[in-house]
Amino acid sequence: MAGETTITVIGNLTSDPELRFTPSGSAVANFTIASTPRTFDRQSNEWKDGETLFLRASVWREAAENVAESLTKGTRVIVSGRLKSRSYETKEGEKRTVIELEVDEIGPSLRYANAKVNRTQRNNNQGAGNGGGFGNQGAGAQATQQDDPWAANSSASAGSWGNGPDSEPPF
């Protein structure tokens, strides 16, 4: 939503993401991120851990399925989203309110790991927000050389000015 404050949290997943489906069929993945600030103590010449923040998070739809398939317990992640409060009642009738992170973007941190990213084929065009990469191509669209402005031009007669060392620039 426009105007809402987003935050970014870097931390480790405390368990594998839990994937569920709503009665209407929407996927949701829930997980907890543990983020511990570290500071360097010059007197003792060592790193000191601060108090760990445990933050519950949820991600929806296709991203939820991608998270459940890709991320596991202990994975260091970078998560961006919006804080939301949610109230509920326990089995004992006590009213509780929790603060959770509604995830907009999530990915593995490459600081201490590497990853090979595989782009998924989209089944339908219900992507809300920035899902799907450059240009939000829908319904399994494949980027062709014609659609890709950065692709090398294979035909020399396409009107480009870089046709050799003696060609004149268009200006």
UniProtKB/Swiss-Prot annotation:
Q: Which PROSITE patterns match?
A: SSB
Would the keyword Cell cycle be found if you checked this record's keyword annotation?
no
Q: Name one GO molecular function term.
A: single-stranded DNA binding
InterPro entries, A to Z: NA-bd_OB-fold, Primosome_PriB/ssb, ssDNA-bd
Q: Which Gene3D superfamilies match?
A: Nucleic acid-binding proteins (2.40.50.140)
Keywords of the record, alphabetical order, are:
DNA-binding, Plasmid
The answer to whether keyword Transport applies is no
Q: Where is the SSB domain?
A: 1-110
Low complexity: compositionally biased ranges: 118-127, 139-164
Please note every region of biased composition (Gly residues): 128-138
- Any one GO biological process: DNA replication
Task: Show the GO cellular component annotation of the record.
Answer: nucleoid
**Sorted alphabetically, which Pfam families does this protein's record hold?**
SSB
Region annotated Disordered sits at 118-171
Assembly and oligomerization: Homotetramer.
Spell out the PANTHER family in the cross-references.
Answer: SINGLE-STRANDED DNA-BINDING PROTEIN
Name the chain's protein.
Single-stranded DNA-binding protein
Q: Which organism is it from?
A: Paenarthrobacter aurescens
